[in-house]
Amino acid sequence: MLILGIETSCDETSIAIYEHADNNKSKILHSVVSSQINLHSSFGGVVPEIASRNHIIKLESLLLQVLNKSEKSINDIDLIGVTNRPGLIGALFTGVAFAKALGYALKKPVLGINHLLGHTLSAELIYENLFPPYYSLIISGGHTHLFFVDNCYNFTLIAKTVDDALGEAFDKVSKMLNLGYPGGPIIEKLAQQGNEKAILLPIGMKNSPNFSFSGLKTHIKLLIDKNIYKAEDIAASFQFTAALTLYKKIMLNKKKYNINKLIISGGVAANNYIKHYLTTGLKDVQLFIPPARLCTDNAEMIAYAAHRLFGRRDFMDLSESAYDKLSVNFY
């Protein structure tokens, strides 16, 4: 079975083909991601209209590229999986419209995939013996959410951010330091030159199982205004506090839930410092963290998620749309 994955939830356009085989040789045949960082960096963040228009420009050429590299024809595709929630609504529309048009023309089924489900299942692409039940922590520019995933891939929300997502906090701190966008890799690189213990920063809602990063962000703004600390020390202290916050929240939730298997995914999971901090600190938790290319937005995870959900046969019809909110059910 050949599954086409399409991802356009934010500012990356991605296409992938996943081949499912019964002989344990299932694999991604080819995947491509077209980043829009150069289009948005001067604005200090993603401009939804620009993102949507660029998806429209890129989708067809990326599809042809993936088919060519996979040595497959469009008629070989058996199933189409497309991100349809949550995300930037205009960006989502472009991918969903493209997928539905392909499905209609080829007479092939289309599955709408929750972006957060894709992030979680990206770990299964790497760890062959990883199966639910497990817990999933998604840390990205739009989400900081902890879920329990049962053996039927039903998600139960355990904890979440009550304000800023962690990736959003990275972007805003970078912007306050006049370092540019996206903030994640910029802060990580600058922090290597700083002292992570130079500044004692607060952990938001430290006694709550939920996450909060707005207070941390505000505290850093006040420090920057005082102009008494070096940027690299601010970056290092912020990154340390972000990692410490994740660790403490996981341990706090572990008191109530049996968090013995934990997937950590999403764009912030590509941060090597945070990855090392949690891997070192959470010694009694089995961690599964995908490589960086699968932490950021990609179509590989969407194609694989479509494979996992195929048995539900909950296919999209032409009247179905995209949804920008997480409150929509996972399936």
Segments from the language model and where they lie:
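Glycine-rich phosphate-binding loops at beta-strand->alpha-helix junctions
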Residues: A91, I259-L278
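A short helix-loop
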Residues: I3-S9, A16-A21, H30-S31, L130-P132, ...
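Conserved phosphate-binding catalytic cores of ATP/NTP-utilizing and phosphoryl-transfer enzymes
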Residues: G112-Y134, Y304-A305
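Glycine-rich beta-strand-to-loop/alpha-helix junction loops that act as flexible
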Residues: V82-R85, L102, S140, I263-N271
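Glycine-rich phosphate-binding/hydrolytic loop that grips phosphoryl groups
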Residues: H119-S122, P290-Y331
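Conserved phosphate-binding/catalytic loops in two-lobed NTP-binding clefts
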Residues: G112-I113, L262, T279-I302
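N-terminal beta-alpha supersecondary unit
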Residues: L2-P86, H115, H119
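Adenine-nucleotide phosphate-binding core of ATP-dependent small-molecule kinases
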Residues: N207-S214, H219-I263
